[in-house]
Every structure is written in C-alpha cells, then in structure tokens.
Amino acid sequence: MNLLPNSSQQQQRLVSDINIRLRKFFERRGYELFSTSMLERTDLYLKKSGGELASRMYSFTDPSGAEVSMRPEFTSSVVKNYVSGLLKGPLPQRWTYSGSVFRYEPGFSGEFQQIGAELLGAGSSDADAEIVAMASQSLSTIGIRGHKIRIGHMGVVSEMLECLGLSKRAGVFLLRNIPQLRTGEAGLAQIRESASRFGLLSSGNNSDLARITREMPQQDVMQMIKGFIGDGMHGALGQRTSEEIISRYLEKLREEGQAEFFDIAIELCKELIGLAGPPLVARKKLTKLAKAYSIPENVFDPIDSFFDSLGHYDMKNVPLILDLASARGIAYYTGIIFDIENPRIKIGRSIGGGGRYDGLIEALGGKKSLPAMGFALNLEQVANLLPKDYDLDLEETPAKILVTAQETAMSEAVATAERLRAQGFFAEIDLECKDDASAAKYAKQRDIQTIMRVGQDGQVNEQFI
C-alpha cells in the first residue's frame, strides 16, 4: 500500500482498522460488500466523468492494444457491474466497497485508499438524506469530530441557468467552470476564452428566431415548426421521429445568441458564490436572488425536500453549509452533491464526498435510466483525523515469538511454531538458525518480545527481550 508521505506501519494499521469498522457500519445499514476490478478500459471513466478526471488518470495501452486505466474512482466500476448483470437483487440495491484508487495529485501519493457506498434504484430525497447522513455518522462512530458538510445541487443550478435562457450545453459548461469564478478576474477571463473557443458566445444567424422560441412554451414551438414544415419532412426521417428531429433543431437554435444570456448567467453564479452559509440563512438569500432574476421559487423544491428528509437524522453536531456554487470534480453528478471538510485538512483535500448521478447507468449501457446516489471517503485522510485516544485494536494483540533452533532440530522448531499459532500466538521461525546474540538482535528489530530456542529433544528454552 502506497500511503501519504511519512507513512508508517502504524498508519497502515490505522487505515486497515478503520476500513474494517466502517465496513461493518455500512453493512449494518444494509450495504453489501462488493469488489471491483482495479484495472478497467479507459473509456469507462471518460464517458461521463469529464476532462478534469481524465487529466489525473494513470492510463496505458495493454498488450492487446486496448487503452486501460487504473481505477480513479469506484462508482463507474460499480455501475458497469450492475449494467452487466453481476449485481443481482431487487431495487433498491445497496453496495459498499473499499480498496485503492489512483489519481495524480501533485505533492501527494498517486494511490490512496477509499471506502464508500452506492445506493442504486432510489431517487427520493430520503435516499439522498440516507447517504449524506451515513457518510457523516460513519466518521462520528470512530470518534472524528469537527467536520462539516458542504451541500450543493447540480440539478437546481442547471435549472436556474435554463430559466435565464442559457442552452443546456452552455449551462453544463458554466457548471463545470464555477470554481474558476472564485479566482477573480483571471478566472473570468479564462472562462470567457474557453466559452468563445467552444462557440458558446457567437451571435449566430438565427438569433431573433432563437429569442422568440425561448420565450414560447416548448409544445407551442413544436407545433409552430411542424406547421412551417408540413409534409416536407416525410421520407427524410431515417430512424428518427419528426419530434426528435425538431427537438434537436431547437436545441441547436437555442445555442445561438447565447452571448446576451451568458453575461447574466455569469453574474448569477458570482452571486451564488457569496450566498453560501447555514441552510436556513442561505435559503432565504436564494429566494431574494431568484426574485431578482425572475426565477420561479419552486426551482428550489428539491433542496427543501432534501433538508426536510435530512432532519430525520441526528445531525445537530455537524455544521451544514448550503453552497450552490460548489462543484465536485466529476461531471456525472445530476442532483445533490456534498463534500465533507475539516479545518485540519489542507484546502483541496476533503475527507470525502459524493452525490446523485441519475444519468450514469444509462450512459454506461443500461437499458433505461436509473436513479443512483453514492459517496466515498479517503481513508488516509480519515486516519489523520482520529482522536489521540483512538483504540486501534478491537482485540488484544497476541504476543510475538521467534522460534529458533539448530539446523538439525528444524523439525522440532516447526512443530513448536505450529502449536503456538494454533493457540493464537504470532510465531515466526528463524530460518537461518542464528546464535543467541544474532537472534536477540533480530528479535528487537522485529519488535518480537520472546525467543524460544528448541533443542533436538523438543525441550524449549525461553528468552525474554
């Protein structure tokens, strides 16, 4: 296991012990253990994860010529196994996992240990609350205090941007780049440059028509265009319906003339950054913001439902922050997202987090869309936050014994070691038949407390170090 700088055997034991305890915590809540492959085809992670993750993956070409990657996260692998039929049972399904993930992060090890859980087939606010509460309570159960949870909602922000007239494509772009706005004018300039490069700021030749269609209900626009076209579309449809063709045309049409809406959307996102705070306080500010931008109040219904459901759990000792400008680094999230933070962890290195990813199962080959929600914790970071009085061992550590003998008595030494192991002791055999001084030196280096020297007659002499 490749741990953080200055790692030690003690750190490894902590990570292993935490892993066992948290896994039992999840299992008591109905989450079954499932293992995934450490190596997957690269396109599994690229379909919906976004470029930010792609730039941090460890990828290579295998002997068959296929592009493969060390897993940078577990969720896509879990979903792949569900789509392929390996995860069986009625919905909703609850799964937990743990193991190494691999991501490039300057100044840190490229490998770290994760444990997490996925809830497949449940799309309610109660499902969101179960995952967020379980992530928080799992830390509390091993004695970690002082963490807070930052909560956002990709679906709500996306709908707010659509209310401003922004196309879906431009909205997705802006959602992914909200963190850049936190860096000030330099970040804003970079966003504009990228938007222009992707053709999001062009006025287009149909900007007047685009504006008119944006102001009309979708059903009326469809009828209007059908009236213009008449029967001229028959015979040229291929496998697509007229509704599908018109919908795609409208999507392209609404991408024109985005420059006038892009500036308004930028200002909205900048204001969202300043509204983060305790849920009740931030929610009141969001109502005022929505009114200022003529956004209907019911756009926030999913947030209200989530906090109502979260209220069923004991979260009074964990500060919550409602921050609609928060964005996780993976692009497949569609609803609630959250990060678990602690002031003792450096900026940019959260303890863990997760979110809702309702479109991922269909994107990875599922026959239909399925709601899903999950999270993961960084076990090394969790280990760094354990209280000083954390009880590492659930059971008393057995005594360590070095069993040594002359070469002619090796059979007796092996038999003695096997008897000790059967009784629960740690018994290591001296394969080099060391003399007393060398054996004592070796035992000290290995933190072994007792040496048992076995004679040919089977008699044992003990030496305590």
Which sequence ranges carry the predicted segments?
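Auxiliary tRNA-acceptor-end handling modules of aminoacyl-tRNA synthetases
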Residues: 1-12, 188-191, 200
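A short beta-strand-loop structural module common to alpha/beta enzyme folds
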Residues: 32-38
